Swiss-Prot record:
Belongs to the DEAD box helicase family. DEAH subfamily. FANCM sub-subfamily. One of its GO terms (cellular component) is nucleus. Residues 594-610, 1149-1161 have a biased composition (Basic and acidic residues). It is found in: Nucleus. Residues 611-625 have a biased composition (Basic residues). Disruption phenotype: Increased incidence of spontaneous mitotic crossovers. Increased sensitivity to DNA damage caused by the cross linking agent nitrogen mustard mechlorethamine (HN2), the alkylating agent methyl methanesulfonate (MMS), and double-strand break inducing ionizing radiation (IR). This is DEAD-box ATP-dependent DNA helicase Fancm. It holds the Pfam family DEAD. GO terms for molecular function: 3'-5' DNA helicase activity; ATP binding; four-way junction DNA binding; four-way junction helicase activity; hydrolase activity.
Length: 1489
C-alpha cells in the first residue's frame, strides 16, 4: 500500500513539473506581448550594449551583480566596504542612457548619507550636473515640483519622495510614469510602514514598469525579515556575498576584533542590589497574578514589553483582568526600573542618575513620585558622584579654544577609564590615524566627548548625533553641522568621532583604523556588522568591544556566533524564495541582448553648488561696495587729450613741492588734533529735512566732541581697509594711517596668530578667516616685512598722549575769553533751537533741575518757607540714637538689609496731596510699594529733598497733614513691612492738629496704619521733632499729645504678658464695648481737637492681619479655658436631679447666680475636641448645657466686671474681618429656631443651608444639647434601620429652656448629629425622673482631654452606645467603655443602667435552667437598638430563636385585638445614616435592624 502511494507521488510530481514549465512559457509569452508597453521611452540606439567603467580596478563580483541588476529587481547583499555604491552608479548610468526622458531616484535613509552618495556617484559615472539634484525637506513643495519636472536624477530621502507622491494625488505633478529606476540604500529598513515600503506601493499602483535595486549589508535578522523586505520592494533576484566568498575574499581587509570585559565594581553592585529589591514587590505582584513568569535576575526590559503587549491584546479581546489597572501600573514600574538597571550596568551610575532628571517642563518621573525608596537611592547616588560633567560647556570661546575641564570628574563606570586608555595608547602610537566610538544613547556620547577633551591635542573628538529634538543635556545637530563634522573628520581636523547609530549605516568615513563599540545594544547582528563595517574598508582595521561582565558579555557572544549565518542561508531558504516577485519587467526590448562594453569614464568636473556660489557672490558684492565708493573717480570721466594751450601751461608750470619745514608743521598739527576734518565733515552732513539752526547745532556738538576726543585717525575698520587697499594712495600715508590706528593693527595681528596656531588648510578657511589672512598680507606689504610691523606694534602712540593732554587742559580752560569769543562768532546769526532738535540730554538736565526746584518750592510753601538741611553725619547720629531708645526697635533694626527702612524715609512725612485725596492701605499696599519702586529716581536730589522735609517738620501748620504714624500690636514679634520710598506715595494716618495742644482719640476714616511698633513710632517722632531748636515748644506739645494717644498701647503690652498665664479673663466683647465708651469719653473731654466721626473711630479700630492672627491664638486658649471643669458642676448636677420638673425661669436664675463672676463676653463656640477640654487629671466640671445656660443668661443681662479696663488694644477692638464677622440671624436661622422640635427641613434644604452658611456652626437640636454622655467621633458610617418608629415623650430639662430664644449659641458642626426628629405629640402624662440615666452619666462620663459633649436626647432617641476595644485612651476619643448593661426597671424604652461588673458565670452547658436576665447578656461593644418591641420583649429570654419570637409577637397581637386594642400602623422603614468622627482605624460598621 505504501509503495503504491509512493508511485502515485512520483507521478504527481512529474505532472506538476510539466505544468510549471508550461505556465512559465505562457508567462514569457505575455511578457513579450507587454514588452513594448514596459519599454516605452527606450532609446533603440543605445540598446545593444551597457557601459561598465574601466578607469577603476575591475572586480568580477561587481560586474556580475551589475549585469543581473540591469534585467531583474535585485537585492544586493554585500559586506561593508565592497562597493555597493559603485554597482548602483553603473546601473543608474545605463538606465540614464537607455531612457533619455526617464527619471532615476536614489533613496537613502538619512540626509548625510544622501549627500555622500550624490558625490560618490558623480565621481564614478559622469551624471551631468544640470540633470542631477538633491531633494530635501527644506525646499518648498512648489520648488520641488519644478525640480521633479525638469531634472532626471534625484537623490533624496524616502520621506520627501513619499510626501511629494501624496501631494501629487490631487494635482498629478509627480512623474509616476517617467520613473524607470529606484535605488534603495540600506534596504533592511523596508519593513512595516517605513517610507521605503510606502514609496514602492504608491509607485506600483501607478506604474508597474520600473526597475528596483536594493542594497544592504545586513538584509535582516531572520529569514522572515528578509522575506518581508523582498515582498515590500518587489524583489525577484538575490545577489548575496559574504566575507568568505571566493570572488569577494581577495578584497576583504582583515579586521581584528578585541574584546575587553569590564567587571562591575562594588560601587555599582550595591546600588544594583538595592534597585532589584525595589523592583521585587512589583514583579512579585505580576507573578502572583499569573501574568508573568521568571526570576528578577533574568528578566529584561524587552521581555516585559512583550508580556505587556500580550496582556493588552488579551484585554482588548474581552479577557480583561479584574486588577487590570494595578497590573498595568506594575508593568510600567518594572519596565522603567529594568531600563534603569540596564543603564546602570552598561553605561554607569552617571547615566542612571541622569535618567531620572525632570523633563523640560519640570515634571519628575512618575516612578520617583510613586516609590520613595527609589527616590532615596537616586539622591544618594547623585550625592556620591559629585559634579556632573554635562554641566560643563564644550563650546569654543572667543579665542577658538574649548575651556579646560576638571580632571577629577566622576563618570560612574569603569568603561570610561578603559576607553581612555585604549584611545590614548592608540593615538600615541599612530598620531595620524582616526577612530570612531559608537554608543547607544546621546548622553553617553556627551560624557565620552568630555572625557576625551581632557586629552587634547592628542585626541580631538567631535560628537555626531541625529537631528532629533533636544532632550535634557543632549543636543541635536542640524544637517549643515553634520556635514561639517564629517568633512572635518575626513580631512583630519578631528581624529575621534563619537557617534550614535546615525554613524553606523552607510557613511564612508574614509580610512578608519579603529572602531570602539562602547556597548552592545541587542542580539541583532545587523547593527554590529554595520558598526564594524566602518573600518577595514581600505586597509586593515581594529575593533575593540567594551562589554560589562554578565548579560552584556553573553549578548556579544550570541552576536559573534550569528553574524555570518544569515547571509549564508539566504540562497537556500524556502521562505525567501516564496516571497520573490514573479512579474518582473525586463525593461529592455526583447530584440536586444545588450552586451557589456568597458569604457573609460571621465567624471564630471566638480562645480560649486549654486547656493554656495550665490552666497559667495553676495558676500563679494558686499565686500566690494565700500571699495567702489571710496576708490578713484577717474573711471567715471572720459579721458581726452589736452589742447595746445593746456599743454603749454602744464609744461611751463612746475609741480608744487612742499618744503621739509612745512611738512613737519603739518604733521605736528595733525598729530596734535588726532582727528581728520574730512571724516568730521563727512559725518556731520545734515539731512535735507533739517533746518539751518538744527544743522548748526548738530555740527557744533560734533565739533565739540571731536575736539575733546582721542579717536583714531580713521575709526571704521572698513574705511581704513578701503584706504589701505587704494592703489593711488601713497605708501607713507598708509603707514601714517596704521600708526594712527594701532588697535586695528594689533587686532589683525592677534587674529592671524590664533589662525596660524589652528593649522587650518587654505582650502578650508571660511570667509572671515580668508579676510583676516588677506588683511594681514596687505599690512605686511605696506610695512615691508615683520620688522616695521613690530615697530608699529611696540611704538608709543603720540597722538594719544597729545589727546590726553588736551583732555587734561582743554582749550576753553586755557583761554576762557578767547573761547567765549570763538563761540560768539560761531553762534552769531543762528536761530533759536527748533522743536525737533537733538537736545535730549539738555532737556533731561533742565527737567530734573526744574522738577527739583518745583518740589522744593512746594515744600517750602507748605512748611512756611523754612529751608533747612543737615549732613548725612548728623542723620547717622540721629539713627544711632534711635536704635538704643527702644528694645523692640533695636530688634527690628537688626534684621536683614532688605527689610530695613532707608534713611531717606521717615515715619513722619509731608503729604503734598489735598485733604480729600487719601488712598487706603488695605488691599493696596503691595501695589503701592511696587509702583514706588518703579518711580523715576532723581539721584542725590531725593536725599536732599527728604532731609529738607524732615528738618522742616517742626513748622507743621493746622491745615497740613502729617505722614503716617505706624501702629502695630506690640506683642507680635518680627513683623515688618517694606517702607515706601517716595514721599509722594505715603498713605499715612492723618493726624490733624487744629490748635497744636490737644489730644486725639480718633483719626480720619480714610487713614491707614503702617505695621510698625509703637515705641519705634514714638522714638522716631521725637527724634524727628527735636532736630530744630526754634521749634521746641511745638515738639513738647506734640510729644505730650502722642504720649497720651499711645498710653493705652503701653498697657496693652502689660495685658498681653498677663493674658498668657490667665485662662478665664478673656473679655473680648466686653473690652470692645468698654473701649468704645472710653473713646467717647476722651472725645468729649478733648473738645478742642478736630471733630472726627464715629466712622473714623471704627475705621481706626479695625484690626489688622496680625491682630486677627493674635485673636485666633487667644481663641484657642479661650476654648481650653472654657471647657475646664468647674467646681460648681457637681452642685448643678445634684440640683438638676431634684428640680428637673421646675419651671425654666428657675434655671435662668440659678445660672445667673452661679455665673455672676464668669466672663459673659465669650462669643466663640467652644471646641469640645480641644487638648485640655476633658483631662482626666482635672476635677469634673460643668456640663455643656450648664455653660450654655450661663452664657445665654449673660447675654440677656450683661454685667461687665468692675475691674475691666478698656484699652486701645487689638484684642479689645471690634472685629471687622469679613470671614468671622458677626451677622444678624437670617430668616432661615429664625425659622430653625422657631421650628425647633416641631419638625425638620427637607434633606436638600438642610444640606444647602449647611453649605451656603457663612457661619461654620449650626444649631443643635433641642433633644441633643444637654447630654453629658460624650459622643464618639468616628469616620465610620453606621446605618440604623428600624421598621417602626418609637413613640417617645420628650423630656425637657431646665437647661434646655434658655436655648429656645434667638440668642442661642451656635455649636460646631462636628459636635452635632443629624438633626432628625420625630413629630412632637401632646404629652398626656409627665414622665417620672429617670435616675438611671444620670447615674450612668456620673459613672461613665468621659474625662478624656480630646472628648466632646453631646446631648442626652441623641441617645434617648438612637439608643446606641458605640464603644471601643482600645484601652489606650491617649489614642481614642472615647474614655468610657460600657462593660455591662441592664434594662432599666422604669417602664420606658431605652432606659438602662450600668451596674458594677460581675463575674461571668458560664452556664451554657446547663440547658434545663432558664437564663437569667442580667448584665452578662450584654457584652462589650454591643449595640442596644431601641424600638417599640423593647417593652414587649421585657422579661423574655434574649436568646430565643426567631420562630419563637415571632409566635410570641403574634400571640400578643391577637390578645390585644380581643381586648379591643388596635395596634398602630407600622411606620415606613427608614434608613438613617450617621457619620461619627473617630480617631481609631476601625472599619465601617453597618447595622441593619
Amino acid at each position: 500500500m505504501d509503495v503504491n502511494w509512493m508511485d502515485d507521488d512520483e507521478d504527481l510530481v512529474a505532472a506538476l513539473a510539466m505544468h510549471e514549465e508550461q505556465k512559465s512559457e505562457d508567462a514569457d509569452g505575455t511578457r513579450w506581448e507587454h514588452c513594448d508597453e514596459a519599454c516605452d521611452g527606450f532609446d533603440m540606439a543605445t540598446g545593444h550594449n551597457w557601459i561598465y567603467p574601466n578607469n577603476l580596478p575591475l572586480r568580477s563580483y561587481q560586474q556580475t551583480i551589475v549585469q543581473s541588476a540591469l534585467f531583474k529587481n535585485t537585492l544586493v547583499v554585500l559586506p561593508t566596504g565592497l562597493g555597493k555604491t559603485f554597482i548602483a552608479a553603473v546601473v543608474m548610468y545605463n538606465f540614464y542612457r537607455w531612457y533619455p526622458k526617464g527619471k532615476i531616484v536614489f533613496m537613502a535613509p538619512t540626509r548625510p548619507l544622501v549627500s555622500q552618495q550624490i558625490h560618490a556617484s558623480q565621481k564614478i559615472m559622469p551624471f551631468p550636473s544640470e540633470d542631477t539634484v538633491q531633494l530635501t525637506g527644506q525646499l518648498p513643495r512648489p520648488k520641488r515640483a519644478e525640480l521633479w519636472a525638469s531634472k532626471r536624477v534625484f537623490f533624496a530621502t524616502p520621506q520627501v519622495v513619499h510626501s511629494d507622491m501624496l501631494e501629487a494625488d490631487g494635482e498629478c505633478s509627480f512623474p509616476f510614469g517617467s520613473i524607470k529606476l529606484i535605488v534603495v540604500d540600506e534596504a533592511h529598513r523596508a519593513k512595516g510602514r517605513y517610507a521605503y515600503t510606502q514609496v514602492a506601493d504608491c509607485l506600483m499602483a501607478r506604474n508597474r514598469y520600473f526597475r528596483m535595486l536594493a542594497l544592504s549589508a545586513t538584509p535582516g535578522r531572520t529569514m522572515e525579515d528578509v522575506a518581508a523586505v523582498c515582498r515590500n520592494l518587489y524583489i525577484s533576484n538575490l545577489q548575496v556575498r559574504w566575507d568568505t566568498s571566493i570572488d569577494v575574499q581577495p578584497y576583504i581587509h582583515r579586521r581584528t576584533i578585541r574584546t575587553i570585559v569590564v567587571s562591575l565594581k562594588e560601587r555599582i553592585k550595591e546600588p544594583r542590589e538595592r534597585l532589584l529589591q525595589i523592583i521585587e514587590p512589583y514583579l512579585r505582584q505580576l507573578m502572583e497574578a499569573e501574568i508573568f513568569k521568571g526570576n528578577k535576575g533574568t528578566v529584561s526590559r524587552n521581555s516585559l514589553l512583550f508580556e505587556q503587549k500580550s496582556f493588552v491584546e488579551r484585554s482588548a479581546q474581552g479577557q480583561r483582568h479584574p486588577d487590570h489597572n494595578i497590573i498595568m501600573g506594575n508593568f510600567a514600574m518594572c519596565i522603567s526600573m529594568y531600563h534603569s538597571l540596564d543603564l546602570m550596568e552598561r553605561h554607569g551610575l552617571r547615566v542612571f542618575v541622569n535618567n531620572f532628571d525632570a523633563d523640560d517642563d519640570g515634571r519628575e518621573k512618575f516612578v520617583l513620585a510613586r516609590d520613595g525608596n527609589l527616590r532615596n537611592l537616586v539622591e544618594q547616588v547623585r550625592q556620591e558622584l559629585g559634579a556632573n560633567p554635562l554641566d560643563y560647556t564644550t563650546h569654543a570661546m572667543t579665542n577658538g579654544e574649548v575651556p579646560p575641564l576638571p580632571s577629577d570628574l566622576d563618570f560612574g563606570h569603569a568603561k570610561y577609564e578603559k576607553l581612555r586608555q585604549v584611545l590614548v595608547q592608540h593615538f600615541q602610537a599612530n598620531p595620524d590615524s582616526r577612530a570612531i566610538v559608537f554608543c547607544e544613547y546621546r548622553e553617553s556620547v556627551m560624557l565620552i566627548h568630555r572625557l576625551l577633551l581632557q586629552h587634547r591635542p592628542v585626541l580631538r573628538p567631535r560628537c555626531f548625533v541625529g537631528q532629533g529634538s533636544t532632550v535634557g543635556a543632549s543636543y541635536a545637530l542640524t544637517q549643515k553641522q553634520q556635514l561639517q563634522i564629517m568633512t572635518d573628520f575626513r580631512s583630519g581636523t578631528s581624529n575621534v568621532l563619537v557617534a550614535t547609530s546615525i554613524g553606523e549605516e552607510g557613511l564612508d568615513v574614509g580610512e578608519v583604523e579603529m572602531i570602539v563599540c562602547f556597548d552592545i545594544c541587542s542580539t541583532n547582528p545587523t547593527r554590529f556588522i554595520q558598526r564594524i563595517g566602518r573600518t577595514g574598508r581600505k586597509k586593515n582595521g581594529e575593533v575593540v568591544m567594551l562589554v560589562t561582565e554578565g548579560r552584556e558579555q553573553q549578548v556579544l557572544k550570541d552576536v559573534l556566533a550569528n553574524k555570518d549565518q544569515i547571509n549564508k542561508k539566504l540562497l537556500n531558504s524556502s521562505v525567501v524564495k516564496l516571497s520573490l516577485y514573479e512579474q518582473n519587467p525586463r525593461m529592455v526590448p526583447s530584440k536586444f541582448q545588450p552586451k557589456c562594453e568597458e569604457k573609460h569614464m571621465e567624471p564630471v568636473a566638480e562645480e560649486k553648488p549654486k547656493p554656495k556660489s550665490a552666497a559667495k557672490t553676495k558676500e563679494s558684492r558686499k565686500r566690494k561696495q565700500p571699495v567702489a565708493q571710496t576708490g578713484s573717480l577717474r573711471k567715471y570721466f572720459k579721458e581726452s587729450p589736452p589742447t595746445e594751450s593746456q599743454q603749454g601751461i602744464l609744461q611751463g608750470i612746475k609741480p608744487y613741492q612742499m618744503s621739509e619745514a612745512s611738512q613737519q608743521l603739518v604733521k605736528q598739527q595733525v598729530l596734535r588734533r588726532s582727528v581728520t576734518l574730512k571724516n568730521f565733515f563727512g559725518e556731520s552732513q545734515a539731512s535735507s529735512t533739517l533746518t539751518s539752526s538744527q544743522e548748526d547745532v548738530q555740527r557744533l556738538r560734533k565739533l565739540t566732541r571731536l575736539l575733546q576726543s582721542s579717536k583714531p585717525f580713521v575709526s571704521d575698520s572698513k574705511d581704513l581697509m578701503s584706504h589701505l587697499q587704494d592703489d593711488h594712495l601713497p605708501r607713507q600715508i598708509k603707514l601714517y594711517l596704521l600708526k594712527s590706528n594701532p588697535e586695528f593693527l594689533r587686532e589683525t595681528h592677534l587674529k592671524m596668530q590664533v589662525q596660524s596656531e589652528l593649522n587650518i588648510a587654505d582650502d578650508r578657511l571660511n570667509s572671515r578667516q580668508r579676510r583676516t589672512k588677506n588683511n594681514y598680507q596687505l599690512l605686511l606689504d605696506i610695512c615691508d616685512g615683520m620688522d616695521q610691523m613690530n615697530e608699529l606694534l611696540q611704538g608709543d602712540n603720540s597722538g594719544a598722549e597729545i589727546s590726553f593732554r588736551d583732555e587734561l587742559n582743554p582749550i576753553y580752560n586755557q583761554s576762557p575769553k578767547k573761547f567765549d569769543t570763538i563761540c560768539e562768532q560761531i553762534f552769531d546769526g543762528l536761530n533759536e533751537h527748533g522743536l525737533n532738535s537733538n537736545n535730549f540730554e539738555l532737556k533731561q538736565d533742565l527737567l530734573e533741575k526744574l522738577e527739583l526746584r518745583n518740589l522744593e518750592t512746594t515744600v517750602n510753601e507748605q512748611l512756611g518757607g523754612i529751608e533747612a538741611s543737615w549732613s548725612e553725619e548728623e542723620w547717622d547720629q540721629q539713627e544711632e540714637d534711635v536704635k538704643f531708645e527702644s528694645m523692640y526697635l533695636s530688634q527690628q533694626l537688626n534684621l536683614p538689609d532688605a527689610n530695613v527702612v532707608p534713611h531717606s524715609s521717615t515715619p513722619l512725612r509731608v503729604k503734598p496731596l489735598s485733604k480729600l485725596m487719601f488712598k487706603t492701605l488695605q488691599g493696596d499696599i503691595e501695589e503701592e510699594y511696587h509702583s514706588g519702586m518703579e518711580a523715576s529716581e532723581l539721584g542725590d536730589n531725593l536725599g536732599r529733598l527728604n532731609s529738607l522735609m524732615n528738618a522742616s517738620e517742626s513748622k507743621i501748620k493746622a491745615t497740613e497733614r502729617i505722614a503716617p504714624i505706624p501702629v502695630v500690636d506690640s506683642t507680635i514679634e518680627t513683623n515688618h513691612f517694606p517702607a515706601v520710598e517716595e514721599s509722594q506715595r505715603s498713605t499715612p494716618i492723618s493726624i490733624a492738629d487744629s490748635s497744636g495742644e490737644s489730644n486725639h482719640c480718633a483719626v480720619n476714616k480714610n487713614s491707614e496704619i503702617y505695621p510698625m511698633s509703637i515705641d519705634e513710632t514714638k522714638v522716631e517722632v521725637k527724634s524727628s521733632l527735636n532736630l530744630k531748636m526754634h521749634a521746641e515748644s511745638i515738639v513738647e506739645d506734640l510729644d505730650i499729645d502722642l504720649d497720651d494717644f499711645l498710653e493705652p498701647m503701653d498697657k496693652e503690652l502689660e495685658l498681653a504678658s498677663q493674658t498668657k498665664g490667665k485662662s478665664q479673663e478673656n473679655i473680648v466683647d466686653h473690652q470692645m464695648e468698654k473701649l468704645e465708651k472710653n473713646c467717647e469719653q476722651k472725645e468729649t473731654a478733648h473738645n478742642n481737637d478736630l471733630d472726627l466721626t464715629d466712622e473714623d473711630l471704627k475705621e481706626f479700630l479695625e484690626p489688622m492681619v496680625e491682630e486677627v492672627e493674635l485673636m485666633s491664638q487667644k481663641k484657642a486658649n479661650d476654648f481650653k479655658d472654657f471647657l475646664e471643669p468647674m467646681p460648681e458642676e457637681l452642685e448643678l448636677m445634684s440640683q438638676q436631679k431634684k428640680n428637673i420638673l421646675l419651671p425654666s425661669t428657675e434655671t435662668i436664675k440659678n445660672s445667673e447666680n452661679k455665673n455672676s463672676h464668669e466672663d459673659g463676653s465669650r462669643t466663640v463656640s467652644p471646641d469640645i475636641f480641644g487638648s485640655d477640654s476633658m483631662s482626666p487629671l482635672k476635677p469634673q466640671g460643668k456640663s455643656l448645657a450648664a455653660k450654655l445656660a450661663a452664657k445665654a443668661a449673660a447675654k440677656v443681662l450683661p454685667c461687665p466686671p468692675p475691674n475691666s479696663v478698656g484699652l486701645n488694644s487689638p484684642e479689645n477692638r471690634k472685629r471687622t474681618n469679613p470671614s468671622i464677622q458677626e451677622k444678624s440671624p437670617s430668616i432661615f436661622d429664625l425659622y430653625l429656631n422657631r421650628m425647633r422640635g416641631r419638625g425638620r427641613l427637607a434633606k436638600a434644604a438642610e444640606n444647602l443651608h449647611r453649605i451656603t452658611s457663612t457661619n461654620p456652626t449650626i444649631s443643635v437640636p433641642k433633644d441633643e444639647e444637654d447630654s453629658p454622655i460624650a459622643r464618639r467621633p468616628s469616620k465610620r458610617k453606621i446605618v440604623i434601620s428600624s421598621d417602626e418608629e418609637e413613640e417617645q415623650k420628650p423630656q425637657i430639662a431646665e437647661t434646655q429652656v434658655d436655648c429656645e430664644s434667638d440668642d442661642y449659641e451656635r455649636i460646631l458642626d462636628t459636635q452635632m448629629p443629624d438633626p432628625r426628629k420625630t413629630p412632637t405629640r401632646p404629652r398626656h402624662k409627665r414622665s417620672k425622673f429617670n435616675s438611671f440615666i444620670l447615674d450612668e452619666a456620673e459613672k461613665s462620663g468621659s474625662d478624656h482631654e480630646e472628648e466632646g459633649e453631646t446631648t442626652i436626647g441623641t441617645y434617648l432617641k438612637d439608643s446606641m452606645i458605640v464603644s471601643s476595644d482600645d484601652e489606650d485612651h491617649n489614642d481614642t476619643n472615647t474614655h468610657a467603655i460600657y462593660l455591662r448593661a441592664l434594662k432599666s426597671p422604669i417602664q420606658r424604652p431605652g432606659a438602662f443602667k450600668m451596674p458594677p461588673p460581675r463575674v461571668f458565670r458560664d452556664e451554657s452547658h446547663i440547658f434545663s435552667q432558664p437564663v437569667e436576665d442580667d448584665s452578662s447578656q450584654y457584652m462589650q461593644c454591643s449595640f442596644i437598638v431601641d424600638d417599640e418591641s423593647s417593652t414587649i420583649e421585657r422579661g423574655h429570654d434574649v436568646s430565643e430563636c426567631p420562630l419563637e419570637k415571632a409566635e410570641r409577637i403574634l400571640k400578643e397581637r391577637r390578645k390585644q385585638r380581643r381586648l379591643g386594642k388596635v395596634p398602630s400602623a407600622p411606620v415606613n422603614k427608614r434608613r438613617r445614616l450617621q457619620t461619627i468622627s473617630t480617631s481609631s482605624d476601625e472599619d465601617d460598621v453597618v447595622l441593619i435592624d
